[in-house]
Amino acid sequence: MDDFLKERLVKYDTWLDRGQISFSSKIIPTRESLSAQQWVLPSEQVLDILCNAQSIAVQKCGCRVHFSRCNKPLEVCFLLNKTGEHAIGKGQARSVSLPEAADIVRKADEYGLIHLTLYRRDHEIYALCNCCPCCCHDLQLMKIYNRQDLVVRSEYVAVTDKDLCINCGKCVERCIFDARTFDDSQLLYNSGLCLGCGLCVTVCPARATVMELRDP
């Protein structure tokens, strides 16, 4: 395991053993994927999280800087409140307004990045990251090292109307959680593997997939 991941995992496991956290991060659906919903949980809206922050800073994604495995945008990770102010003071981040933050979120959506909220030991959200599976420490720990306990799924799940689906495969390419596969040119979807990021919704040309609240 890479030292970068090992250091992060040791920190998480220490906090878990002490009962200081129950998970490290949580999936937040993309804004566009929830646009058809008449009512959306406030905690599931990226902009609501940013609006409720006293201050917002943005910095380059530490994971993509470290691993350099893709050409996705770098300056897309938000630090909130005191965490952001501390990073600004050290020259590691810059302050951004809410409109600029919204533009960064839209850019992240376009590049297929996954919104992850990161939590302190006191359960406060201190960062909202826009993550790629090839570099993100939490997504790597979950997918490669089988630590599903670290990343919590969103309260939403993708639902696909088979009658509307044209089996184009774009959602299969988009899904990083292996919830969607092809068999004899037919889409197979395992909703149990869906973590509710919403990326499949925004890429569907037939609008066959929508996000719905999960069953309790």
PLM regions and their residue ranges:
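Conserved active-site and cofactor/substrate-binding residues in soluble primary-metabolism enzymes
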Residues: 41, 96-99, 166, 195
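General detector of N-terminal leader/presequence modules that precede the first folded domain
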Residues: 1-86
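Ferredoxin-like iron-sulfur electron-transfer modules
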Residues: 116-127, 145-167, 172-174, 178-196, ...
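Short, cationic-aromatic polyanion-contact patches
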Residues: 132, 196-197
